[in-house]
Swiss-Prot record:
Keyword Cell membrane among record annotations: no
Cross-link (Isoglutamyl lysine isopeptide (Lys-Gln) (interchain with Q-Cter in protein Pup)), chain numbering: 47
Protein name: Probable cold shock protein A
Gene3D superfamilies cross-referenced by the UniProt entry: Nucleic acid-binding proteins
One of the record's GO cellular component terms: cytoplasm
Compartment annotation: Cytoplasm
Cystines in this chain: none
The species this protein was found in: Mycolicibacterium smegmatis (strain ATCC 700084 / mc(2)155)
Keywords assigned by UniProt, alphabetized: Activator, Cytoplasm, DNA-binding, Isopeptide bond, Transcription, Transcription regulation, Ubl conjugation
Length: 67
């Protein structure tokens, strides 16, 4: 499972970007793909693991979990 670092995440709008560790292009992340209960958000520079899926607008992180 790929890992990366949260580049930024806007909790009000519910989305942000993850910088993958392999140096590939940043990946869009939507709050609905963050695993867990309650208010789902991410913090800048937080380490995460995720899968990459395709959305109509391009690559999107799915199954995002903090590590």
């Amino acid at each position: 499972m790929p890992q990366g670092t949260v580049k930024w995440f806007n909790a009000e709008k519910g989305f942000g970007f993850i910088a993958p560790e392999d140096g590939s292009a940043d990946v869009f992340v939507h709050y609905t793909e963050i695993q867990g209960s309650g208010f789902r958000t991410l913090e800048e520079n937080q380490k995460v693991e995720f899968e990459v899926g395709q959305s109509p607008k391009g690559p999107q992180a799915t199954g995002v979990r903090t590590i």
